[in-house]
Regions:
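N-terminal Rossmann-like FAD-binding beta1-loop-alpha1 element of flavoenzymes
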Residues: 2-29
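Glycine-rich FAD pyrophosphate-binding loop
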Residues: 21-46
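Mid-domain catalytic core of redox enzymes
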Residues: 23, 217-279
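Conserved beta-strand segments of alpha/beta enzyme cores
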Residues: 26, 76, 210-212
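Short aromatic-enriched loop/helix-cap "lid" or pocket-rim segments at secondary-structure transitions
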Residues: 40-43, 98-99, 227, 244-245
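Short glycine/proline- and charge-enriched loop/turn segments
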Residues: 44-53, 182-186
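Dinucleotide-binding Rossmann-like beta1-alpha1 core, especially the glycine-rich loop
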Residues: 47-126
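Active-site/ligand-binding neighborhood in enzyme catalytic cores
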Residues: 92-229, 233-240
Length: 279
């Protein structure tokens, strides 16, 4: 029987390990942490609340996609549509991504239709930019100077550790601008969360009889000689000892506090230049 080594017990590692095991291969999964799930790992706290160890992870996709079909082998689903609001300087909150309501809140205008919204957007957008060279130019081209200052420039600096002018355009281009009042963060037709969280999915995957899971173990390059195939799913720069330099991952510090407050959306963004990014 052919043998496969998978480095990392996160989402990519789980898919590779399961598919190889289902194909009749013997699979060993090596994970340096003491838990499965990678960044999707979650757990229940003392109050029965689901806590995401490395920040919330949401699932949104086309309902006919392979990812929905594959994950549905291991979980039932609970409907969840994510919403984000930004805290303005006067304490009010407004939807993100920018939509018609956001424009009305910031500029104190009344935009009755998508057509009126498009006309208003064109009046504040930087029309001189044809092909944005960085994320800052993406923001200027899509929402103009004032909204770039309010929502994106300070937040990007906190989030990435460098200004939007130094971040490639593809990053900023991920953020949509809407002419309707849809305040959902995503528009996919399948927006759900696993009924019991993400961790039970991984536990089911790695319980496959042809998968051997080894936790608390760093990958040793010498081990590759004992396997027919090796799959790396962790940070590739770390795998090569950073000898080609470090890749620019964004960094977020998570602080857990209990406060008596009910937010108006699941995620509240601090888009100013203060210490925090969101809660």
């Amino acid at each position: 029987m052919k043998s496969v080594l998978v480095i990392g017990a996160g989402l990519a590692g789980a898919v590779i390990a399961w598919e190889c095991a289902e194909a009749g291969l013997h699979v060993t999964v090596v994970e340096k942490q003491d838990r499965v799930g990678g960044n999707c790992h979650d757990y229940d706290n003392e109050y029965g609340e689901k806590i995401s160890s490395d920040g919330p992870h949401l699932f949104h996709a086309d309902e006919n996609s392979f990812s929905v079909e594959w994950l549905s082998q291991f979980t039932n689903w609970v409907k969840y549509e994510h919403r984000v609001r930004a805290i303005l300087s006067d304490g009010r909150t407004t939807p993100l991504p920018v939509n018609r309501t956001t424009l009305e809140d910031v500029f104190d205008v009344d935009l009755g239709t998508p057509g009126e919204t498009r006309i208003f957007l064109s009046s504040i957008q930087d029309q001189s930019i044809e092909t944005p060279k960085n994320s800052d130019e993406v923001f200027l081209k899509s929402v103009g100077e004032e909204l770039a200052d309010i929502f994106f420039r300070p937040y990007t600096l906190k989030h990435w550790g460098k200004p939007a002018t130094e971040i490639e355009a593809a990053v900023g281009a991920r953020i949509p601008v809407r002419t309707n009042r849809d305040d959902r963060y995503f528009t996919d037709n399948f927006q759900y969360l696993p009924e019991h969280g993400f961790t039970p999915i991984f536990e089911k995957v790695f319980s496959h009889p042809r998968i051997n899971l080894v936790l608390n173990t760093e990958y040793d390059h010498k081990a590759a000689q004992f396997f027919d195939q090796v799959f790396l799913t962790g940070p590739i720069d770390a795998h090569y000892g950073y000898r080609f330099g470090r890749l620019p991952y964004r960094s977020v510090k998570f602080i857990e506090e209990e406060i008596d407050y009910t937010p108006s959306a699941t995620t509240m963004n601090f888009t100013d230049d203060g210490e925090y990014t969101r809660f």
